[in-house]
């Protein structure tokens, strides 16, 4: 019965449009020496200090503030890591923006049974409501990494339109 209701619902409602993406910025993050807290009730906890860096996009650019960290929790089988990076950025004109970036790293089999590596995250920005960057507060963002020199990570950030 549920399947027939679901099928009928699909036939009676318009399909949502596939979201588009708009490039927002590239963050070039410098990292400190990682350390391990150890096994916790939730999994193995690692912490990677965020020591600085820069960011640049069509509508903003500036620096990444030293003092944040990427808090990682590794599953018991070691295949899945949840990430929560918390840090602040400062625009070229002195506006501070808080960032909380949550994501997943997975290395294992995909739905087809093939070996897979997945690493994506969803940053949330908290810009001052009275600033010209307040538009960052009102959208969903996704990011994907690339790796370069040791001790660095680059994140490309897009706004879901």
Regions found by a protein language model. Give the residues of each.
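Bacterial Sec-dependent N-terminal signal peptides
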Residues: 1-12
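Beta-strand-enriched cores of mature, soluble protein domains
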Residues: 10-161
């Amino acid at each position: 019965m549920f399947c027939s209701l679901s099928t009928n619902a699909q036939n009676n409602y318009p399909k949502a449009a596939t979201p588009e993406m708009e490039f927002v910025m590239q963050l070039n993050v410098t990292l400190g020496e990682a350390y391990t807290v150890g096994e916790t009730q939730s999994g193995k906890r690692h912490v990677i200090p965020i020591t600085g860096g820069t960011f640049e996009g069509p509508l903003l650019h500036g620096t990444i503030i030293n003092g944040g960290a990427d808090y990682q929790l590794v599953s018991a089988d070691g295949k899945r890591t949840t990430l929560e990076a918390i840090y602040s950025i400062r625009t070229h004109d002195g506006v501070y923006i808080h960032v909380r970036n949550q994501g997943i790293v997975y290395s294992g089999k995909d739905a087809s049974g093939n070996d897979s590596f997945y690493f994506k995250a969803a940053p949330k920005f908290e810009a001052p409501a009275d600033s010209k960057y307040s538009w960052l507060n009102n959208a969903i963002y996704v990011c994907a990494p690339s790796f370069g020199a040791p001790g660095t990570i680059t994140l490309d950030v897009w706004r879901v339109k």
